[in-house]
């Protein structure tokens, strides 16, 4: 169950709402390998643990876009809207990959609803997201995510 569940007619009142934190999720080598297969990005810093030990990060790292894609499952732990006929991932305004995520690390999402606006047939929210790496000061990803909810 998400941290916050609201009725569709309340979404316009949510600007500035801190959604808190998701649970931590471990990044596994299997997950990285599957992402590499799905995207045809088999760079050795991701998929060759032996070679990556001697690389710039001392271990294999997750693809930046793999870490970014975790926004969706982590986001589902934080927020939901009841009474919407459709829920759409509308896009991203700003994304920065600020720190590599080593395989075996655990990440979580912190999110705040930054803006809310009406759109034809519904409501759009802009969410300020930070994907944190457990035990590290610098986050993995900072992104502004746009979602739309239609009546």
Functional labels for PLM-detected ranges:
Residues 2-62:
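Catalytic strand-loop segment that frames the active site of acyl-thioester-processing enzymes
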Residues 53-59, 69-110:
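Hydrophobic beta-strand-centered segment that forms part of the acyl-chain substrate-binding groove
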Residues 1-14, 100-151:
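HotDog/MaoC-like acyl-thioester-processing domains
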Residues 15, 21-23, 31, 41, ...:
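A generic structural signal for short beta-strands and their flanking turns/coil linkers
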Residues 65-67:
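A solvent-exposed, acidic/Ser-Thr-rich amphipathic alpha-helical stretch
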